[in-house]
Design a protein with these regions (language model features):
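Transmembrane alpha-helical hairpins and terminal membrane-anchor modules
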Residues: 214-299
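Short alpha-helical segments that sit at the start of domains
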Residues: 292, 296-340
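Minor-groove-contacting beta-hairpin "wing" of winged helix-turn-helix DNA-binding domains
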Residues: 385-390
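Short, amphipathic alpha-helical interaction segments positioned at domain boundaries
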Residues: 392-407
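Basic, amphipathic N-terminal segments
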Residues: 1-224
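A short, conserved structural fragment
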Residues: 370-384
């Protein structure tokens, strides 16, 4: 199986570092450094204002079904999950998350778990499920093998970030809801880090741990062998006695069986030994399952980054960073190029720069970056499709006018 991840839209560097890399590139003189920094600061301020408005809309649309809400409403509010989703999905796209399709999720559910745990998710309890991921990469992990006697290296596809949105059905079974402390029709929004692609099912709130065939065999085979030993040593005399009683009662022989005190003690001792053995095997099974649940819980504890409203606060910050980086890069490469460029040429130059300077395979979002520059009037497009950046002095003036128009 080819584990090579696709080129990513997400730019895995901070906007401050991207700005410094542009300044260190050597194509701007010292006077232009200050002007370029000022242009970048104004762009960041404009994007920050836009995303602040997005944040307010998200807070308003989420408040009616926010499970962590600690404020009171002045009047009854209707739940509008659709309005929230209409705000959330474009935000995830701006933050360069990719949607996990139903087919991708189905494939992930069929793959072997990295943690060697068999998990089951009941999707019939959900009215709506959304999964988004960002930063797919190939990682290597050391995992135990041969019953823990040795370890070996395995490669697996990993998501750096995963967002999951779940809305439970309004007609969720009351017993199920009470057992899992879930309110019918409620919503869960979570953000996780470092999630193996094959273990996406562990993120769902109703995930149950099941024993794999190998785990059942590890308990069952030794149990069968030791059980045979118990029966032959502890229950042999008891079985002979019970067989004689059964034969006498069924008329298979006429010799009566005497049940004296010694026979009764042997009978109950044998039954007690078998009962004790069965109880021990049941506890072995239960304890092994508890260890699996503990392993799952520990993994989720360290992978969970945020919940509910905290998730879209983080996403707002991520999306704002991505918008700033894309705009700064596109403007810088147009500004420092000796002639006008087409969108394709600009895209290829930026991606080549990341590959050669930063050893990073990037699928730069050229269309989105140019849309921002055009909206800010920082780039002009000729009839033949070539693009030219506005010089720094005019760009500063234009951005300043945009800022003044906000208030």
């Amino acid at each position: 199986m080819d584990l090579k991840p696709p080129a990513k839209r997400f730019i895995p560097f901070r906007k401050r570092d991207i700005l410094q890399l542009c300044l260190d590139d050597g194509k701007l003189d010292q006077a232009q450094h200050t002007a370029f920094r000022n242009c970048s600061s104004l762009m960041q301020a404009l994007f920050h204002f836009e995303f602040h408005q997005r944040l307010e809309r998200l807070k308003d649309s989420f408040s009616s079904f926010n499970p962590d809400r600690d404020t009171h409403s002045l009047k009854p509010e209707e739940k509008h999950c659709d309005a929230f989703i209409q705000e959330l999905e474009p935000l995830l796209d701006k933050a360069n998350f990719e949607k996990v399709s139903e087919a991708d999720l189905a494939r992930a559910l069929c793959e072997d778990s990295l943690f060697k745990i068999k998990l089951h998710v009941d999707f019939d309890e959900f009215a709506e499920v959304l999964l988004y991921c960002r930063g797919e990469s190939i990682r290597t992990e050391s995992v135990p093998a041969l019953f823990g006697l040795k370890r070996h290296q395995v490669q697996f596809a990993n998501y750096d970030r995963v967002v999951i949105y779940i809305r439970f059905k309004d007609d969720l079974d009351p017993k199920t809801a009470a057992a899992r402390d879930i309110k019918p029709g409620s919503v869960i929004l979570k953000l996780f880090k470092n999630v193996p692609k094959a273990d996406l099912e562990m993120l769902f709130p109703n995930t149950t741990v099941r024993m794999r065939l190998i785990d059942k065999l590890m308990i069952g085979v030794p149990a069968a062998i030791s059980g045979g030993v118990v029966i032959s040593t502890k229950l042999g005399a008891t079985l002979v006695l019970l067989g004689s009683l059964f034969g006498f009662w069924m008329g298979m022989h006429s010799t009566p069986v005497e049940l004296d005190k010694a026979a009764l003690i042997a009978l109950f001792a044998g039954l007690g030994a078998v009962g004790s053995y069965l109880w021990k095997q049941f506890n072995n099974f239960k304890n092994r399952k508890l260890r699996f649940v503990q392993s799952l819980t520990q993994n989720l504890y360290f992978k969970n980054l945020d919940n509910n409203a905290g998730v879209f606060h983080r996403l707002i910050d991520d999306a704002e960073e991505e918008e700033c980086k894309e705009a700064i890069l596109a403007y810088y490469f147009l500004l420092t190029h000796s002639s006008a460029m087409t969108a394709t040429e600009l895209d290829q130059q930026i991606e080549r720069w990341f590959r050669e300077i930063l050893n990073c395979e990037l699928d730069f979002e050229i269309d989105d970056a140019l849309d921002k520059l055009k909206r800010l009037q920082l780039v002009s497009e000729a009839p033949n499709g070539t693009l030219t950046a506005m010089p720094l002095p005019q760009a500063l003036s234009t951005l300043d006018q945009h800022w003044d128009q906000l208030f």
